[in-house]
């Protein structure tokens, strides 16, 4: 093998005339009787290795490419070893594709230019006109007829190296191509470096949810995404990922509108149902620089951490139409008008929301802006007549009985719903609250017969008041009587009588009421439509548990907003994938699908041939049956990245 060395060349900028140095890895090769210097790899302008270490770096690379050429391992500093491993991996990844090796051999066309071997080259890629980076999302053309490549190798010399995950990345790129995200980012004037970093952030959140710093490490050491995009993430600073988040936040409204428009076109969605709800997530640290980070009621029981609130407007299919970040202690009812203003929903669109948001002021606003609404009624008296009800079934097979009652003004109706499962739950709650309240009353009674206990009328009334305050509504069902002594200053006896208040949880367990101005639907259609609101809960579970919404590690409001928005975009991609898979009978959660996809790896196998040369083969592992089923359902290649061969 011809020895390699590093050449430094001075180049002048054609526009400014400014001079600068570029670095290339070259080797000597005899052509037509003359020795020519052949560029093996462009190392860019900002090559970080000192000149004194160039020979050591080249020797280590030669050893990695042809292990038999050096009998003992070289003692290299850590930064030299990392650089050698990185550049050797690039040489193998950029080797010519094997004919007939796979339909996706060239699917990883660079989003950032033809050659992104270094950070400097990546910095220049926005000057290169690019096509679709992935090629995923379209059925791959048939591969050419496979040709045999028979070679004699030493079996004992076989080594595997550079294992990287590729399955999740491949499917995520399919979703990104379906949504046309790269074209949209290009249209918005975002250069190739930032496009690559935005995709790195997004796919990292889909495949291995973590902070930007952890994602940067994942892109370099665990993922083959760089190969699919032809981007050298090892040549990029981790700060690029943070800046990519900032740039993406600057285009939030345009990106949300584009993504929802894309899924509407792909799946033929009808914009007739709008779901709205909020959730919150907690911060790591005090986040003193973020005004939105406030202490409040944490849905994860993290009252020790400041919170931020995420509001989502979704359509009936579970895709996000709009998202916005609010303060952690925001009142739910105060957010609706902010989210729906300017939404440009179709006339008569139906808004569904729970009781926390369905204030009378919000209902009046919906009526004023000609929305239809289907909401959970806040408060009010419970009522239900089983004889006037009809039955329906939930997806879980539970029976729910429905009674429709027209309002006095004829403009709104109430749908009273009775659930057997909810009845059992509420009966247990009422029993527990009443038992605790009666135990508190009995404790007061026991104290009246003991010496040195407080028996004054005023103090006993205060104790009863505190007991009522903690009773969670159970006290309303009790009539309490205090019998004072003749002096009127102390209590002689205390008694109580339990009488259920009609129209309450105790008298009508399992009953809740929906209110709507949709008057021409039957009971079953109204309830089944309202039941789609439970889809938001599954969305929030996916965002938090599967896509890394919590916790938030950032301290400034802009970075927190960026973290949440990237998570929402990741959810859109996952929802697209799951929607396509459901149409083919695959309905697993994303956590389950991700485990199946993560099994597939891309590795380099090196072996010594009979002629003394070393053969390096970069190839993706064969898809297992469960994974193959996913690829076939999505219509994408089962061998992303193809096969690359390099003989040294």
Model regions and ranges:
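Anion-binding and metal-coordination hotspots
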Residues: 3-6, 15, 21-24, 98-139, ...
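Glycine-rich, N-terminal phosphate-binding loop and its surrounding beta-alpha-beta segment
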Residues: 57-102, 112, 123, 129-131, ...
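Extended interaction-bearing regions that mediate binding to partners or small molecules
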Residues: 1-82, 86, 97, 101, ...
């Amino acid at each position: 093998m011809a020895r390699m060395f590093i050449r430094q060349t001075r180049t002048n900028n054609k526009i400014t005339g400014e001079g600068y140095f570029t670095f290339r890895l070259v080797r000597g090769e005899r052509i037509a009787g003359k020795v020519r210097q052949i560029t093996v790899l462009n190392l860019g302008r900002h090559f970080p290795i000192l000149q004194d270490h160039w020979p050591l770096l080249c020797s280590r690379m030669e050893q990695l490419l042809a292990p038999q050429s050096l009998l003992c391992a070289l003692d290299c500093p850590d930064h030299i070893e990392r650089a050698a491993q990185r550049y050797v991996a690039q040489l193998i990844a950029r080797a010519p594709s094997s004919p007939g090796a796979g339909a996706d051999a060239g699917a990883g066309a660079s989003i950032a230019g033809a050659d992104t071997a270094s950070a400097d080259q990546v910095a220049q890629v926005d000057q290169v006109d690019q096509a679709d980076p992935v090629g995923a999302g379209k059925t791959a053309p048939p591969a050419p007829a496979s040709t045999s490549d028979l070679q004699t190798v030493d079996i004992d010399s076989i080594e595997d190296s550079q294992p990287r995950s590729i399955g999740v990345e491949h499917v995520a790129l399919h979703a990104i191509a379906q949504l046309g995200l790269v074209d949209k980012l290009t249209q918005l004037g975002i250069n190739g470096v930032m496009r690559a970093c935005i995709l790195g952030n997004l796919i990292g959140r889909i495949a291995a949810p973590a902070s930007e710093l952890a994602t940067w490490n994942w892109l370099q050491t665990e993922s083959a995404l760089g190969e699919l995009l032809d981007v050298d993430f090892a040549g990029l600073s981790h700060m690029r990922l943070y800046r990519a988040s900032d740039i993406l936040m600057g285009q939030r409204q345009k990106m949300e509108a584009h993504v929802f428009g894309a899924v509407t076109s792909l799946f033929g969605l009808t914009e007739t149902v709008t779901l709205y709800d909020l959730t919150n997530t907690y911060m790591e640290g005090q986040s003193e620089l973020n005004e939105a980070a406030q202490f409040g009621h944490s849905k994860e029981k993290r009252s020790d951490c400041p919170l931020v609130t995420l509001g989502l407007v979704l359509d009936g299919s579970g895709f996000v139409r709009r998202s916005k970040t609010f303060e952690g202690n925001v009142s739910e009812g105060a957010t609706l008008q902010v989210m729906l203003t300017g939404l440009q929903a179709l006339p008569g669109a139906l808004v569904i929301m729970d009781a926390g948001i369905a204030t009378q002021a919000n209902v009046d606003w919906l009526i004023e802006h000609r929305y239809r609404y289907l909401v959970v009624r806040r408060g009010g008296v419970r009522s239900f007549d089983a004889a006037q009800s009809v039955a329906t079934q939930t997806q879980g097979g539970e029976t729910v009985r429905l009674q429709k009652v027209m309002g006095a003004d004829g403009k709104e109706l109430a749908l009273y719903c009775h659930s057997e499962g909810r009845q059992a739950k509420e009966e247990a709650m009422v029993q527990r609250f009443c038992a605790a309240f009666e135990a508190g009353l009995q404790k007061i009674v026991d104290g009246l017969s003991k010496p040195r206990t407080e028996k004054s009328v005023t103090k006993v009334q205060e104790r009863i008041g505190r007991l009522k305050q903690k009773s969670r509504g159970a006290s309303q069902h009790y009539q309490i009587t205090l019998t004072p002594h003749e002096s009127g200053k102390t209590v002689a006896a205390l008694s109580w009588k339990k009488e259920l208040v009609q129209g309450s949880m105790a008298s009508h367990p399992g009953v809740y009421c929906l209110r709507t101005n949709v008057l021409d639907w039957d009971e079953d259609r109204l309830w089944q439509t309202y039941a789609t609101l439970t889809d938001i809960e599954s969305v929030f579970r996916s965002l938090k548990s599967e896509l890394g919404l919590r916790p938030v590690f950032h301290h400034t409001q802009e970075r927190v907003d960026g973290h949440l928005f990237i998570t929402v975009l990741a959810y859109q991609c996952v929802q697209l994938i799951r929607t396509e898979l459901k149409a083919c009978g695959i309905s697993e959660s994303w956590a389950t699908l991700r485990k199946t996809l993560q099994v597939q790896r891309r590795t380099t196998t090196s072996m010594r041939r009979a002629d003394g040369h070393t053969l390096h083969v970069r190839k993706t592992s064969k898809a297992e049956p469960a994974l193959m089923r996913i690829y076939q359902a999505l219509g994408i290649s089962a061998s992303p990245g193809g096969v690359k061969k390099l003989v040294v």
